[in-house]
Amino acid sequence: MTRPTVHVSLACWPGLRHDQAARHLASDVVEPLFGRLCTDHVQLVPQNFGVLTEAMVDGLMAAFPQVRFRLHANVRVLPEHHLADLSGYPAHREWFRQAARISRRLAAPAYTAHAGARRDATMAEMLEHTRRCADLFGCVVGVEGQYPAAGDAWLVSTWPEYQRLFESGVPYAIDLSHLHILACHSGVHDDALVRDMLACDRCIEVHVSANDGHGDWHQVCEQPPWWWPLLQYINPKAVVFSEGNHRRKRTP
C-alpha cells in the first residue's frame, strides 16, 4: 500500500508558542510510519501557547508563504480561554467571531472543531451549529468526532453516532486515534464505516496519532495500527495531519 501524504500539525510541538512551534517548519519533520511530513497545509492548534493574534498570523504567512495555514478546534484567539466546541456555538459567539476573522485573514480553506459536550446541544443542534459556523467562517467547516468518556459526556463518541454524522450531509474530520479509543472501549472495529467515511468527499481532514486505547495521548505513530490498511481509501481532497508529539514520548 502506498502511504498517504501526511501534513504537519503544530500539535506536534505542544506547549510552545505558535511562532516557536512554526520554526520547526523550516526543517524536515520525519516520523517512523509516515516518513517526511508535508508542509503544504499546517494546522494551528490549541496545544500551543499564547494568543494567536492578527499580527502573529501575518508574521507566519510572511515567514512561510508556501504554507496554507488553517485553524483547528478552540485554538486560543482571545486573551481569555474558551472551550469553544460546536455544541456550544451559541455560548461562544465572541470566540467564533474572532476565530472567523483569523481564519479569513489566513485565507484558510477549512476549519474543523470537536462536536463537543452533550450537555450543550443535541446531535441535531450541533450539526446545525456547524452549518451556521461555515456561514460565519466563509469556508468549509467540519465536525471532528470524539470517543467514549466518563458520564457519556461527548457527542459523536459511539459507532451509531459516527454513522449519523456520516449520513447528515455535514463535512467532517476523522481522527483515527479517537476511533482507536472507541474500538478498544466498545470491542468493535467498524472497518466498513471507517472506510466509507474516509472515502467520502465530505471527509475534509484525517488526523493520525497513537495511543493505548485508553486516552488521547497524541503520540507519534511508530507501528501500523489496525486502521493502517484503511488509509488507502482516503478521498484525494482530504488533508491528513499528524498530531503526534515530537517533543516528548509518553512512558507506560
Segment roles from a protein language model:
Residues 21-23, 27, 54-58, 121-132, ...:
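Distinct, well-ordered alpha-helical segments
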Residues 2-10, 19, 32-33, 93, ...:
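Histidine-acidic metal/acid-base catalytic patches
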Residues 82-174, 228:
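Active-site acidic/histidine proton-transfer and metal-coordination neighborhood
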Residues 41-45, 112, 142, 173, ...:
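Conserved beta-strand positions in the central sheet of alpha/beta enzyme cores
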Residues 39, 68, 140, 171, ...:
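Hydrophobic "anchor" residues on beta-strands that sit immediately upstream
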Residues 66, 108, 139, 236-237:
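Short, well-ordered coil loops that connect the C-terminus of an alpha-helix to the N-terminus
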Residues 1-97:
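N-terminal pre-domain/capping segments
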Residues 9-15, 45-49, 72-76, 116-118, ...:
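Active-site beta-loop-alpha junctions enriched in small/polar residues
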